[in-house]
Amino acid sequence: MIKKKVLLLYAHPSQHRSEVNQPLFKAASKIKGVTAVDLYGEYPTFNIDIVKEQQQLLEHDVVIFQFPLFWYSTPAILKEWQDLVLEYGFAYGDGADALKYKLFLCALSVGDKEVLIRQMAIFTLR
């Protein structure tokens, strides 16, 4: 059992083609203590509820972004979420300590073979 409250924010625009992220998200969703949020499912029109999302951040100890890496970046919904929710005065700036002592992790996947990734020198895989 997980003692810390975990917020898993999942962003995959093509879930029907996901071979890695979707199964991981479904498995994590079943773990007690994990709040799993499918951002594309929750906000199909990108109309993100900033107050709700900030409240969720306050209520959790660990925040995980789960997404496939596209062109060295996050999917659009996650970028929009970051831009809106992690605003000045809440996530950073004078007196902003809402995220202080929170653990942040990224669980990301890439869609190419390890050999190709090594050749492109994007990552060093061991």
Per-segment meaning from a language model:
Residues 15-16, 45, 70-73:
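Glycine-/small-residue-rich active-site loops that bind phosphorylated ligands and cofactors
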Residues 19-23, 48, 76-80:
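Generic recognition of short, well-ordered alpha-helical segments
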Residues 10-13, 39-41, 67:
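Short glycine-centered, acidic/aromatic-flanked micro-motifs in structured strand/loop junctions
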